[in-house]
């Protein structure tokens, strides 16, 4: 078995059998690569590739004025350095962005009035600032106004052409009406559809339908062109007395029953008898013999056919029959011929008649009938018709109609199929246009209609719109590109108007451009688009999943009300591309999906998944990425197919997928095989061990609930994992990886300094400083805290984990805790999924988490004067001010509770007119307190915690208070420390290199005391200060130059370091950009410690969730034979009906892992007593198995082995990958090696009585998570508070400090009990009887206990509503009084 070695700190025993040939790609690559493509550097002009910001500029520029006397061209663009880095933007509530500078060229022409010839008069070039462009952080997010946001990728229908039918729903007969739709990337939609009478219609932008021939006329075709495009011509030759002779096509009669005998024209022989079915064999025989070329058709066989072209009298030009006219033969009731077009032709002596090849079996007369029904006969009237539909109410002219029609589909500014659309159209219609042809062509429209008619005739298949070849992904870059294009087009209109209105010779490009529309479009997209979402930052997994999300909602997508079942369902093409498990449970089910683990998005926006190539039944290591359309052509085997040593299939028949169907196929026909069993599922689902044993519904809940797990105080990686925990921790950015190899120079809680020894470039000081995030608040108020894992002097390699983040443990994702559980009922406390916990869990902070709340207060400049942040608050006692410093701001470390003042603030009050007495008192005592009111920020009810950080922001030019200056000093000191450390390492490196250069060389001259020509030795250098070493001039010219170069490099790096430091200090000291009217802002961060308590929600990884019902003293919990009390008691009835048996296997495996860990712990104890390593090595061999032990552990030296063994004493971690994990035999083997019974059950004793329970109980170790549904956040109480304005009833919800709704059903309950007075009280004085409420308050104050109920306000609202309807309604008492 392969062995995964994660971070070299802890080994996982790996149970996977299938060899992995492909590394899992970076999990946030989707976001990063897309935005990188959008912002790719624009220094050098690039060809018009239509990609990224370059493509946007090239599609909008050049801009000409209305007279075409000037043109504004785009030259290049450049992104400057961002003003603030990511951390500064988060602290200051700024957007992390870089200024975009665009170089534009304005060319002014001289126009010769006589000839109209243009000559260049003037060319001006200038750099123009075009607003700020948000940048992506290294973790694939954006900082917008100080908060981290994610742009979710959108799934939408790919541009191209689609064929479909209405499934028989439109017409009562259930007839299938076929339709075709051309969807461009941007521009008007074009639909073609059949109606119930089999006529073909076109619609533009879903407006009123027109006959499709109107559209074809508009394209410049005439009646004859349309006939030729859609029908073949067959000539019928008249044979007197016998009928008509025509060409014979044997294929046409296959499977039909001819109504008349089919007769060979040459021999008169009957080929097929009337009424008999023609078999395929008979047809094949006719084709093979090939001696029947023409057949004889009875005279009336031509009646009802349609003429293929105009038949004209040669002499006088009179038209007998027009193309498309029906050939008729009119007979009266006596049988005498009275007329008809056929008679006219025969009378005129026309013996050969070309007719349209329509047999109404394989070819229908749809297009001919549509032509006949169309009132238009030429291009002009057809264009006018289209104009009337598109612009109803406007008087049409031919020029306007023609211009409108051209801009609809043939103007690249208005219509864009995109490369994807063109490729899809070429594939569907077998065309070969270049993918740079982005508008429609006449051939495209004609081919679409042809394919639609073929469908109606029974040839071809409709498209499946849910196939992933017909749905594509728009990632960040593309969404941003579209948005920016909208902004630039708005700007273009303004530029054109300005070019016409100003004196063009004197202006510069800067004067023509107002970049606001473009900047506003960007701001609007990041701030308010449906796809720009507040990042889910509960834990590292939720971050990664959010970035990999695919949404079908959003602008240009579906709406959840209109999305049907098919769109939401799992499709065969989702395999390896989109996860069939992870999706929300509510109304968005199936509309929001997750990218599968190995999937990636190709340049056309289609999702691809990797496969290994199979050649002649042998699996190779060559990996190919396939989109859904490409995969349809292949036969794909599953990753778990049995292979022999050489990689060939063992079985003759292999389980495969062919064009969406699961079949058994011979091994020779297989040409691809999955790269890994987990390529089917998403990241969250692949973190569930034994996923294959869980029901899909529960697996869905498990995937979703892992994202809600709160990071705990002490992270603990799962004993039973799947092997990808390390990948998630790495790619999420939670754990810190070394950028390059080197030695640890310094470590403390806030930073790690590495002296790099690898990947050094000339001029690089080789110092990497990693700043750790300490107790920062995430978007979800969880705590982001990083802890170093390394010691000074440690050697680290590139990408080694050097620090753990939230929910990571030694570089592995750790969302919950390994705890000992027992499946048994316990006095009804685990009824309905309740969970019973031991007091030990609460006492030892096993599931304690830290949450950080942010409170913000701003002092504004009001009309009555500025607000002030101060400690001097009117009518507040010293006790309430105990936590405030002299500036009125709470100090760090203060423990605060509900109602405590965090920041003291006073606001000027409106002056009320003073009485003379007040004026006198004011004059004598200078009483000032009356004109300000206390608006201090207090802690809301229900919150307790410790102040961990305070930030003070001052406006430019506002004097800083003592607290602000203190914070500033601390920040500057921290920056200075960083600078000094970097300088020290730089000096150490440079002087070490200098020493190597000059040691043993001859000095020509040097500082005082060094004789010319003396050799440079250690002793000599020891007598000089380091600064004097540079003064030693070497004899060798080349070496002297190298020393000089080193000196210059050293000085340059010192200057750069100082400049960087000064820039940062200047930013700290500079005032802050605050919103208008705000003079000063204070943010207070409070850390809240949340222990596990009844009402908190917990869950496992298998969708098994529950709420804690009771905390039981440790001594009362059931305990094992060795006296160990269990931590959790779960209900066994929660397993069978839910069918998530994976949790039981996990429990057994975890029990075995714990048993192994205890054995290793015993062996370490033995080693400490005797100093003998043998027991430790044996215990490790037993735990990991011989093969893995030999491969990874046997070669370790004693210290390394002891460290590894010490890390697994609580339990030996194992990895059981999804669909390729431990089987039942492996579980039994693990239990046996750990010394347990293979049933996984143990004897348990009742903690209260000490008696053994009657039967054995399943006990094991399970990984449980604490979810972000904490009872502290939900519990809430109110006495008096805010009321709704209209109804005067208390508001609802904790956020509004609302009350508990006493609803309709609750009223029924009280009525049923006959509790009349209680009911009256509930509906009046405790709710919306305003006068009654006041009276109750008064009687409470007076100490009385009587009150009177009045009329509820909601009744008054009802009366007013009824009066609003014009009905007078009054409330009268028994005496008839109002």
Swiss-Prot record:
Catalytic activity: RNA(n) + a ribonucleoside 5'-triphosphate = RNA(n+1) + diphosphate
GO molecular function: DNA binding; DNA-directed RNA polymerase activity; ribonucleoside binding
InterPro entries (alphabetical): DNA-dir_RNA_pol_bsu_ext_1_sf, DNA-dir_RNA_pol_bsu_external_1, DNA-dir_RNA_pol_su2, DNA-dir_RNAP_su2_dom, DNA-dir_RNAP_su2_hyb_sf, RNA_pol_bsu_bac, RNA_pol_bsu_CS, RNA_pol_bsu_protrusion
EC number: 2.7.7.6
Superkingdom: Bacteria
Membership in a protein family: Belongs to the RNA polymerase beta chain family.
Function: DNA-dependent RNA polymerase catalyzes the transcription of DNA into RNA using the four ribonucleoside triphosphates as substrates.
Stated name of the protein: DNA-directed RNA polymerase subunit beta
Organism: Dinoroseobacter shibae (strain DSM 16493 / NCIMB 14021 / DFL 12)
């Amino acid at each position: 078995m392969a062995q995964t070695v994660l971070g070299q700190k802890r080994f996982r025993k790996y149970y996977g059998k299938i060899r992995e040939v492909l590394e899992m790609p970076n999990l946030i690559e989707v976001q990063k690569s897309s935005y990188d493509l959008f912002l790719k550097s624009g220094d050098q002009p690039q060809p018009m590739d239509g990609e990224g910001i370059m493509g946007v500029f090239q599609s909008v520029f050049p801009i000409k004025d209305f007279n075409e006397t000037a043109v504004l061209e785009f030259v290049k663009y450049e992104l400057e350095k961002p003003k603030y880095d990511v951390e500064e933007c988060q602290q200051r509530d700024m957007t992390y962005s870089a200024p975009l500078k665009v170089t534009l060229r304005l060319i002014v022409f001289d126009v010769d009035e006589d000839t109209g010839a243009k000559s260049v008069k003037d060319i001006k070039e200038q750099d123009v600032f075009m607003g700020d462009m948000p940048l992506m952080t290294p973790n694939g997010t954006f900082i917008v106004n100080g908060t981290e946001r994610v742009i979710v990728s959108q799934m939408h229908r790919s541009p191209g052409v689609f064929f479909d039918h209405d499934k028989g729903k439109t017409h009562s007969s259930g007839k299938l009406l076929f339709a075709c739709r051309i969807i461009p990337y941007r521009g008007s939609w074009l639909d073609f559809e059949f109606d119930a009478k089999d006529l073909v219609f076109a619609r533009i932008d879903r407006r009123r339908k027109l006959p499709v021939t109107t559209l074809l006329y508009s394209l410049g075709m005439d009646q004859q062109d349309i006939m030729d495009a859609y029908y073949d011509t067959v000539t019928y030759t008249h044979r007197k007395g016998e009928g008509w002779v025509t060409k014979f096509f044997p294929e046409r009669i296959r499977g039909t029953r001819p109504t008349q005998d089919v007769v060979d024209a040459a021999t008169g022989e009957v080929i097929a008898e009337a009424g008999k079915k023609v078999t395929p064999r008979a047809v094949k025989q006719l084709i093979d013999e090939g001696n029947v070329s023409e057949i004889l058709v009875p005279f009336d066989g031509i009646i009802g056919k349609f003429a293929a072209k105009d038949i004209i009298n040669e002499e006088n030009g009179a038209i007998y029959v027009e193309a498309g006219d029906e050939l008729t033969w009119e007979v009266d009731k006596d049988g005498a011929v009275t007329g008809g077009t056929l008679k006219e032709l025969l009378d005129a002596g026309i013996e050969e008649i070309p007719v349209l090849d329509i047999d109404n079996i394989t070819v229908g007369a749809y297009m001919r009938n549509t032509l006949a029904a169309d009132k238009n006969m030429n291009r002009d009237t057809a264009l006018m018709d289209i104009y009337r539909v598109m612009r109803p109410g406007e008087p049409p002219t031919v020029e306007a109609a023609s211009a409108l029609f051209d801009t609809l589909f043939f103007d690249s500014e208005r219509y864009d199929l995109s490369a994807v659309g063109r490729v899809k159209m070429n594939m569907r219609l077998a065309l070969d246009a270049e993918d740079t042809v982005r508008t429609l062509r006449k051939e495209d429209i004609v081919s679409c209609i042809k394919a639609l008619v073929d469908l109606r005739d029974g040839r071809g298949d409709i498209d499946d719109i849910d196939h992933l070849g017909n749905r594509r992904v728009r990632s960040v870059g593309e969404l941003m590109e579209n948005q920016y294009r909208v902004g630039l087009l708005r700007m273009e209109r303004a530029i054109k108007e300005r070019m016409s209105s100003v004196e063009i010779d004197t202006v510069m490009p800067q004067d023509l451009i107002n970049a606001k529309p473009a900047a506003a479009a960007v701001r609007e997209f990041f701030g308010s688009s449906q796809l720009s979402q507040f990042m889910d930052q509960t834990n590292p997994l939720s971050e990664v999943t959010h970035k990999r999300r695919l949404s079908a909602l959003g602008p240009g997508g579906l709406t959840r009300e209109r999305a049907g079942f098919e769109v939401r369902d799992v499709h065969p093409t989702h395999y390896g591309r989109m996860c069939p498990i992870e999706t929300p449970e509510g109304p968005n089910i199936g509309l929001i999906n997750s990218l599968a683990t190995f999937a990636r998005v190709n340049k056309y926006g289609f999702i691809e998944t990797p496969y290994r190539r199979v050649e002649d039944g042998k699996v190779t290591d060559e990996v190919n990425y396939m989109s859904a359309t490409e995969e349809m052509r292949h036969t794909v085997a599953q990753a778990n197919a049995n292979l022999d040593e050489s990689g060939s299939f063992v079985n003759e028949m292999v389980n495969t997928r062919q064009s969406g169907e699961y079949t058994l196929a011979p091994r020779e026909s297989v040409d691809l095989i999955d790269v890994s069993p987990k390529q089917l599922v998403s990241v969250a689902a692949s973190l569930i061990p034994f996923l294959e044993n869980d029901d899909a519904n529960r697996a869905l809940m498990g995937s979703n609930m892992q994202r809600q797990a709160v990071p705990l105080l002490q992270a603990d990686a799962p004993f039973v994992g799947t092997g990808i925990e390390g990948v998630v921790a790495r790619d999420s950015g939670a754990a810190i990886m070394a950028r390059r190899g080197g030695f640890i120079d310094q470590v403390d809680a806030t930073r790690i300094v590495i002296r790099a020894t690898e990947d050094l470039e000339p001029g690089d000081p080789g110092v990497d400083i990693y700043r750790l995030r300490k107790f920062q608040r995430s978007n979800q108020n969880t705590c982001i805290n990083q802890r170093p894992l390394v010691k000074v002097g440690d050697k680290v390699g590139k990408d080694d984990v050097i620090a753990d983040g939230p929910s990571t443990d030694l570089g592995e994702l750790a969302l919950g805790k390994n705890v000992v559980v027992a499946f048994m009922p316990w006095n009804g406390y685990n009824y309905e999924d309740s969970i019973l916990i031991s007091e030990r869990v609460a006492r030892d902070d096993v599931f304690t988490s830290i949450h950080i709340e942010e409170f913000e207060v701003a002092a504004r400049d009001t009309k009555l004067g500025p607000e002030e942040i101060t400690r001097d608050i009117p009518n507040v006692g010293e006790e309430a001010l105990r936590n405030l410093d002299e500036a009125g701001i709470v100090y760090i470390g203060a423990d605060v509770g509900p109602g405590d003042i965090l920041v003291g603030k006073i606001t000027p009050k409106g002056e009320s007119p003073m009485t003379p007495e007040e004026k006198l008192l004011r004059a004598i005592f200078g009483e000032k307190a009356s004109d300000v009111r206390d608006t201090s920020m207090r802690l809301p009810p229900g919150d307790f915690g410790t102040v961990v950080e305070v930030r003070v922001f001052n406006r430019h030019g506002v004097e800083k208070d003592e607290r602000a200056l203190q914070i500033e000093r601390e920040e500057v000191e921290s920056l200075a420390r960083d600078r000094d450390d970097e300088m020290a390492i730089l000096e150490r490196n440079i002087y070490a290199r200098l020493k190597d250069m000059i040691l043993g060389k001859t000095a020509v001259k040097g500082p005082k005391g060094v004789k010319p020509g003396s050799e440079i030795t250690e002793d000599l250098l020891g007598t000089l200060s380091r600064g004097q070493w540079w003064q030693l001039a070497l004899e060798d010219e080349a070496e002297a130059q190298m020393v000089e170069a080193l000196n210059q490099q050293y000085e340059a790096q010192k200057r750069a370091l100082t400049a960087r430091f000064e820039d940062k200090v200047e930013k700290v000291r500079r005032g802050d950009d605050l919103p208008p009217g705000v003079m000063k802002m204070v943010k207070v961060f409070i850390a809240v410690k949340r222990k596990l308590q009844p009402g908190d929600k917990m869950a496992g990884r298998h969708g098994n969730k529950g709420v804690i019902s009771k905390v039981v003293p440790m001594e009362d919990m059931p305990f094992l034979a060795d006296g160990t009390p269990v931590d959790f008691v779960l209900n066994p009835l929660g397993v069978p009906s839910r069918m998530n048996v994976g949790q039981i296997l996990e429990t057994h495996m975890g029990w075995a892992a714990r048993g192994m860990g205890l054995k290793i712990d015993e062996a370490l104890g033995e080693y400490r007593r005797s100093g003998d390593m043998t027991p430790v090595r044996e215990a490790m061999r037993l735990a990991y198995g011989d093969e893995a032990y030999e491969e990874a552990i046997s070669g370790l030296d004693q210290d390394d082995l002891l460290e590894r063994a010490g890390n697994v004493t609580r339990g030996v971690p194992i990895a059981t990958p999804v669909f390729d994990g431990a089987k039942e035999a492996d579980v039994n083997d693990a239990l046996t090696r750990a010394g347990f019974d293979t049933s996984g059950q143990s004897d348990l004793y009742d903690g209260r009585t000490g008696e053994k329970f009657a039967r054995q109980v399943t006990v094991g170790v399970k990984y449980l998570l604490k979810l972000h549904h904490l009872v502290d956040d939900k519990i809430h109480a109110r006495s008096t508070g805010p009321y709704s304005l209209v109804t005067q009833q208390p508001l609802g919800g904790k956020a509004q400090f609302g009350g508990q709704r006493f609803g309709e059903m609750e009223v029924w309950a009280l009525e049923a009990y006959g509790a009349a007075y209680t009911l009256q009280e509930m509906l009046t004085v405790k709710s919306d009887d305003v006068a009654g409420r006041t009276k109750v308050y008064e009687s409470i104050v007076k100490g009385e206990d009587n009150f009177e109920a009045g009329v509820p306000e909601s009744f008054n609202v009802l009366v007013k509503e009824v009066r609003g309807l014009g009905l007078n309604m009054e409330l009268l008492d028994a005496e008839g009084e109002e």
